[in-house]
Amino acid sequence: MKVAVLGAGAWGTALAAHLAVRHDTLLWARDAALVAELAVRRENARYLGGVALPPGLRYEADLATALSHAQADDALCVIAAPVAGLRALCRAMRDARRVPAHFVWVCKGFEADTRRLPHQMVAEELPDHASYGVLSGPSFAREVAQGLPVALTVASASAACRERTLAAFHHGAMRIYTGDDVVGVEVGGAVKNVLAIATGIADGLGLGLNARAALVTRGLAEMSRLGVALGGRAETFTGLTGLGDLILTATGDLSRNRSVGLQLAAGRSLDDILAALGHVAEGVRCARAVLSIARERGVDMPITEAVCAVLFDGVAPRDAVSGLLRRDAKAE
């Protein structure tokens, strides 16, 4: 199978490495210097240092060439750009008249200014296309690149897209599940990043494992309430893309969003944290959108409110936790 992966960050590189073991895989990056470096070193030192890339993986800086690689009906395109770059890539595909027959995206979050989920952006930019979906689940790029076991879900309204994605990814140590609840999968992937910041704050303050368990559990309730309000199915949030992704991102030491929370608890400013991080922390990007949508829909999300208060309103992390503890008692 021919597969094109658009985006050579950590996640795009890891997925391309997995795909190249079995398929004719092309990894596209906008930065020609990075493409040249990848071809020579067989390693993405910028985003995934120390991981040797498969000898069969090829690299490309020209987007039209990369898209042409995935045009056939038996091919697949994987968009591994962050949420902020998804719309632009869809426009580029449309303008080049090279929209792949089947494609999936792996970004998580809401578009900051429009509050759109990824599938809404895709539908707006490519209204005549139907065979697309989202691939998501509890996964750290480095572990995937190292060939460690992982389980992901592809959600799409198109059976052809689900089948093509399954055929591409389901091999080696990667297990793929399929479904059609695109909204539920995307909401889970967005909200878990915000909740991971909360868990990082609690852990950074030394509040203990009891507090962590409470935050994860009540955070899952917030995620589910919002997802159902937006049209997702409740059962999706107890699966890989809801509870599974939340547990990993909230507790795993490779989580960028958890790291933001830990550093906020240590007294560092958000600007300094993001500058030092050097990579995307989607929980920071989409926290405002999540809270805004929740308020608009009448969905109670106190943990998300507390995170936004710390990130954007200057509330001290310990004061935000105290505010949560002072909330009125209620039935679970």
UniProtKB/Swiss-Prot annotation:
Database matches in InterPro entries: 6-PGluconate_DH-like_C_sf, 6PGD_dom2, G3P_DH_NAD-dep, G3P_DH_NAD-dep_C, G3P_DH_NAD-dep_N, NAD(P)-bd_dom_sf
Record field: catalytic activity: sn-glycerol 3-phosphate + NAD(+) = dihydroxyacetone phosphate + NADH + H(+); sn-glycerol 3-phosphate + NADP(+) = dihydroxyacetone phosphate + NADPH + H(+)
Keyword set includes Plastid: no
NCBIfam families recorded: PRK00094.1-2 (NF000940), PRK00094.1-4 (NF000942)
Positions contributing to sn-glycerol 3-phosphate binding: K108, G137, S139, K192, D245, S255, R256, N257
Organism: Burkholderia pseudomallei (strain 1710b)
Enzyme class: oxidoreductase
Entry keyword set: Cytoplasm, Lipid biosynthesis, Lipid metabolism, NAD, NADP, Nucleotide-binding, Oxidoreductase, Phospholipid biosynthesis, Phospholipid metabolism
Residues that coordinate or bind NADPH: W11, R30, K108, A141, R256, V280, E282
Record-listed E.C. numbers: 1.1.1.94
Family membership noted in the UniProt record: Belongs to the NAD-dependent glycerol-3-phosphate dehydrogenase family.
Location of the protein in the cell: Cytoplasm
GO cellular component, one term: cytosol
Role summary: Catalyzes the reduction of the glycolytic intermediate dihydroxyacetone phosphate (DHAP) to sn-glycerol 3-phosphate (G3P), the key precursor for phospholipid synthesis.
Domain of life of the native organism: Bacteria
Protein name per Swiss-Prot or TrEMBL: Glycerol-3-phosphate dehydrogenase [NAD(P)+]
Active site residues according to the UniProt entry: K192
Pathway: Membrane lipid metabolism; glycerophospholipid metabolism
Single annotated GO MF: glycerol-3-phosphate dehydrogenase [NAD(P)+] activity
Keyword Nucleotide-binding carried by entry: yes
A single GO BP: carbohydrate metabolic process
